[in-house]
Amino acid sequence: MSLNRTHRARRGFTLLELLVVMFILVLLAGTVTALVMKRTEDAKHARAKADIASFETAIDLYKLDNQAYPPSLEALRAKPSGDELPNWNGPYVKKAVPADPWGRAYLYQAPGEHNQDSYDLFSLGKDGQEGGAGNDADILNWD
């Protein structure tokens, strides 16, 4: 008889044990999701910084050839119509100017407000607003 009782006690997990395991799994899933989301935002910031560095190189090459900064980022891809640029040696970028990692255009201004003797080039970051910190921080070529 005692053998039969022991056998019944080992048939499965109790509801409490299952709830504890489920709670632990939910905590782990939440932690992993938060870490992945942070890494995704970090990667977007890194891509925006790399894009800006690449544009800076192309803009500097444009200036070397034409003795002036381009009127827009699109001028890196196609010679501006109506401008007399006998030394234009582009395209200075291989593909069309991409959007920033959040789907908005990079902002370019020559002469710059912050770099008055050259140009400002930046992305407004995740929030699309000037300023911000952390994931919402702007990616700038003057900091």
Which sequence ranges carry the predicted segments?
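Short beta-to-alpha loop/turn elements within the nucleotide-binding domains of ABC transporters
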Residues: F13, T31, P71
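Conserved coupling/switch loop of ABC ATPases
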Residues: T14-F23, K44
